[in-house]
Amino acid sequence: MKHIAAVIVVTAVLLFTQTYTSARGAEYKIPQTVDMTPVAEEPAELYALSAVLMDGESGRVLYEKDGERPLANASTTKVLTCIVALENSSGDDYVQVSQNAASQPEVKLGLQKGEQYYLEDLLYSLMLKSHNDTAVAIAEHCGGSVEGFARMLNRKAKQIGCEDTYFITPNGLDA
């Protein structure tokens, strides 16, 4: 189970932070002159609703477009759902599927009410295929309800330093 947690955390970091750093011990010589000629023209319009470009070393924001704009957490919610589930349960727990979980919209595994699965299997489904029904089944198992699990997500988000972040569902869909 710890191996799964490590793989998920590493995957999440690589996929969602987009921070790149140099290899340890590598020595670089800074050139005396740097060609500052743009490689390409700046796009006339950035198509993303919001964007932030940050220096990975200093944390300084280099570019921002509506960086404070509230947006849906989307599938990044599922990463935190997985982390909270791993911290509050065991992979060999049996999870019974409710009607609420079974009735989630696409993308879904196709869980049916009354079926039982190992939590570990549902976590794989959640992280590899982003299944909405497995997120709800996991949430109901670990938090007693979607609402209870949302409180757990919000506590964890605050604990790890997330600001202006609020979870309502374990799958990132609108409530």
Walk through the language-model features, giving the residues of each.
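Sec-dependent N-terminal signal peptides of Gram-positive bacterial secreted proteins and lipoproteins
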Residues: 2-22
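Active-site-adjacent loops and short helices of periplasmic peptidoglycan-processing enzymes
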Residues: 23-175
